[in-house]
């Protein structure tokens, strides 16, 4: 698990949603939004969607079937090292339109120090593959990661521009309890940007 990750703390949920949960959420959203759903996407965030158990992932995507004509697309977030042609074929067949990659940094030393489990090269390769399939590409960046600095953050931003994604999300690093990053902070080994 990465140094800053704790999905239970981030989402406040200790359980995984079921396909029925997805259907009920989408049914309520469709009812609440009415015609505005035509401008809304179904989204699977809060982790690495393509890294979860394949049968579970497919069951969640199956739960979206009867709602696809009501929403303008499906957006997922995942890790760069969990993208390949097989997974993109599956996502395309289920109507996924946008894929956001949790790249976080384009400096390998920062990725390694934060236990990301992927390299900058995997961001380049998966981004190219995603774009070749016609998906909208989003890249996620975190500023102020452990072992990063302003220059490395600027390098990441400049590299993102070269990749030319459709969207970019920039997050500040937040220290969550019960993470390696919290331990580093408490031990005085990590100082967040002020």
Identify what each model region corresponds to.
Residues 1, 36-37:
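N-terminal glycine-rich anion-binding loops that anchor highly charged ligand groups
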Residues 1-9:
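Local cysteine-cluster metal-coordination motifs and their immediate loop/turn environment
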Residues 10-24, 42, 46-194:
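Conserved non-cysteine loop/helix-boundary elements of the Radical SAM core domain that shape
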Residues 24-35:
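A short, N-terminal amphipathic alpha-helix
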């Amino acid at each position: 698990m990465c140094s800053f990750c704790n999905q239970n703390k981030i989402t406040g949920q200790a359980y995984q949603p079921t396909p029925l949960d997805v259907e009920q959420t989408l049914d309520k959203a469709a009812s609440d939004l009415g015609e505005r759903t035509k401008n809304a996407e179904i989204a699977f965030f809060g982790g690495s969607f393509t890294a979860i158990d394949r049968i579970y992932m497919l069951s969640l995507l199956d739960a979206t079937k009867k709602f696809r004509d009501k929403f303008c697309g499906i957006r997922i977030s995942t890790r760069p090292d969990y993208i390949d042609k097989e997974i993109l074929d599956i996502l395309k067949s289920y109507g996924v339109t946008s894929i956001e990659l949790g790249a976080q940094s384009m400096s390998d030393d920062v990725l390694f120090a934060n236990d990301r489990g992927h390299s900058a090269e995997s961001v380049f390769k998966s981004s190219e593959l995603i774009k070749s399939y016609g998906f909208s590409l989003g890249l996620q960046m975190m500023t102020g990661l452990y072992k990063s600095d302003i220059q490395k953050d600027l390098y990441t931003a400049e590299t993102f521009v070269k990749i030319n994604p459709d969207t970019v999300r920039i997050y500040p690093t937040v220290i969550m309890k019960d993470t390696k990053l919290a331990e580093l902070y408490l031990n005085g080994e990590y100082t967040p940007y002020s």
